[in-house]
Structures are given as structure tokens and as C-alpha cells.
A protein has these predicted regions:
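Nucleotide-sugar donor-binding catalytic core of glycosyltransferases
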Residues: 1-225, 235, 239, 245-246, ...
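Short helix-start
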Residues: 229
Length: 314
């Protein structure tokens, strides 16, 4: 995630990274999950801690990571849009839109630190695998794999950890990439990683959930989407050997991604060009209207590890 923020979201700008909260900065990046426990995401500050830092450092841009679980009701963080020029968040929750100010924007989740950006994009006809699955095979993903067996020819699986080069090679040699749900929502890195490498993400979702999750900058990604995995596989089979159509799908996906990045850069450039105006009265007025955070979600794999307490800014 750090690579995505530094190399893509802020890729047009020179970044000097500080792992402290005492240095004046233009961009503040922090993780937003339930702060009452250590989690797989690492240290997460409370809303009050983040607000205090923002009031002190006056960053022009805030980038919020995590916050995948709307059940935790972290929407109070969206009010930080009243005291910064631009608040970018990596998940979009329909239930939180009532707290969005004009300065709050949901951006694509992006890619993990376990993958490099591709140097070239292979056209569909030059790809070795019809479809690919890499990752943990959770129970909800077994049905997905069972349905994709109908397209058995030239498939590949990897259930162990792959290095950056191996994962990139697999994506760049795959036509379709079935994308199961993330830990707590439809959104996950795999959809964007496949897109960036020119593979075609395949998602099972209702229209309403897909729109609620992925409507970034008022535009939906042009992935293959179906109500069931059976329907999704049928859609893939219909275009499996239609290489002009596959190339069109690939081109549309890549163009969508480049538009998302370009829009992010435009908004960031504008935000950096302005002085910060902190509307404290409006901030305080709206706090009482927001559902407070709740400790209701347990993340699989949570431990009490000693994790460095840090927020990074640049």
C-alpha cells in the first residue's frame, strides 16, 4: 500500500517521508481501524489523535488507509475534510456518504507492496493462461474456483506466497482473473492489480453493491460483473476466443485506470496549490450528527504483537 501511495497517488510529486508527527507536512497518511486493539493493519490512531495532528500540522491533503469495515462506524473521520484541502479515502461506503464534504473523495484501493508495476502489457492473444487464481482459498472462494473449472484449459493456481516478479509474470500472462471478496467488503487489491497488468477482473456482485463500492469520481470500472459465479464464467466463455473483444475489454480497463490516476493527480495538484482553511466551527457543529465509532469487528489473525506506533507523513 505504501508503494501505491508514494509511486502512484503521489507519483507526480517529490516526496520526503517522515515517520513522526512533529514535522510540518503537505500530506498526512494514516491508518483507520478500531484503535482499541492491535490489528493486522498495524497501529491506528483514534479520531481525536488524528484531529489534533491535523490542527497542528495543517496538511493540505489527508490520505486515509484501511477503514474497510463500515460496521466500525469510522465516518467521523470524514469530517476532517473541513480542516484540510483534500481528504482521500481508500474505501467507499454508501452508509457514510452523509458525512462526505465537498473535499472528501474515495480513491481506488490500488495495489499491495507485493507487486511491481508492469514494464509492458501483453495483448490477450499472447497470454499463456485463460484464467488465474493466486491467494488464500477461503470457503467463499471455493465456489468461484469450482465454476471456473469449466474453463479448465490453460489455468494456473498459486496458494503460496509469490515474490513480486512471479506474481507480476502470472498477471501479465492471464486473460481473466476471478476476484473474490476482500476480508470484509467486495473491494480488494486483486481487482486493481489485474487491471494494471492488463488482465480482466471478474467480479460476482449485485449491481447495487458494485456501484456502492466502486463508484470513484462518478465512474465505475468496466470489469466483468455478474450476479453469480456461474453467470460470470458464462460471460467469460462468450468472449474467450474473441481476441478483438478481449483487446477492447483490456483497453477499456487500462484507460479507466489511467483516468482514475489522472483525476487523483489533478485534485492533488489543486489542493497543494491552495492555503489550508480550517473551518473549526463547522467541524464541531457536525460532530454531533455522526454515529460514533464502535468496536464491533474482529479481524482474523489479530494478535497482540508489538507494532510500532507511527503515522507517516510526506
Amino acid at each position: 500500500m505504501r508503494d501505491y501511495i508514494v509511486n502512484t497517488v503521489l507519483g507526480n510529486y517529490k516526496c520526503v517521508i517522515f515517520y513522526d508527527t512533529s514535522t510540518i507536512c503537505d500530506v498526512l497518511v494514516y491508518t483507520c481501524v478500531d484503535p482499541s486493539r492491535q490489528s493486522i493493519y498495524g497501529y491506528s490512531p483514534s479520531y481525536r489523535q488524528v484531529e489534533d495532528i491535523v490542527l497542528k500540522l495543517k496538511p493540505k491533503i489527508i490520505i486515509q488507509l484501511a477503514d474497510e469495515c463500515p460496521q466500525e462506524h469510522n465516518e467521523v473521520h470524514n469530517l476532517l475534510g473541513y480542516i484540510t484541502n483534500l481528504f482521500l479515502r481508500c474505501h467507499r461506503h454508501e452508509s457514510q456518504l452523509y458525512t462526505y464534504t465537498s473535499k472528501v473523495e474515495a480513491i481506488p484501493l490500488g495495489y499491495s507492496n507485493y507487486i511491481d508495476l508492469p514494464l509492458e502489457i501483453k495483448p490477450p492473444q499472447d497470454r499463456k493462461y485463460t484464467w488465474t487464481w493466486t491467494g488464500t482459498l477461503r470457503p467463499d472462494r471455493k465456489q468461484m474456483i469450482q465454476e471456473f473449472w469449466r474453463m479448465w484449459n490453460n489455468a494456473t493456481f498459486a496458494f503460496t506466497n509469490l515474490n513480486k516478479e512471479e506474481l507480476g509474470t502470472i498477471y501479465n500472462n492471464s486473460v481473466f482473473v476471478p476476484c473474490g471478496r476482500g476480508n470484509f467488503s467486495l473491494d480488494c487489491y486483486r481487482q486493481y492489480e489485474a487491471t494494471i497488468y492488463g488482465a480482466i477482473p471478474v467480479v460476482m456482485s449485485s449491481v447495487s453493491e458494485f456501484e456502492a463500492t466502486f463508484k470513484f469520481f462518478d465512474e465505475l470500472p468496466p470489469w466483468i460483473v455478474a450476479d453469480t459465479w456461474e453467470q460470470a464464467v458464462t460471460l467469460c466463455q462468450q468472449v474467450q476466443f474473441d481476441y478483438p473483444k478481449l483487446l477492447e475489454l483490456q483497453t477499456n480497463n487500462l484507460a479507466w485506470w489511467h483516468r482514475m490516476v489522472s483525476t487523483m493527480h489533478s485534485k492533488i495538484t489543486q489542493a497543494l496549490s491552495l492555503e489550508v482553511v480550517q473551518n473549526l466551527d463547522i467541524l464541531e457543529l457536525n460532530k454531533s450528527k455522526v454515529t460514533p465509532p464502535q468496536s464491533v469487528v474482529y479481524y482474523p489473525g489479530d494478535t497482540k504483537r508489538d507494532i510500532d506506533n507511527r503515522i507517516f507523513a510526506c
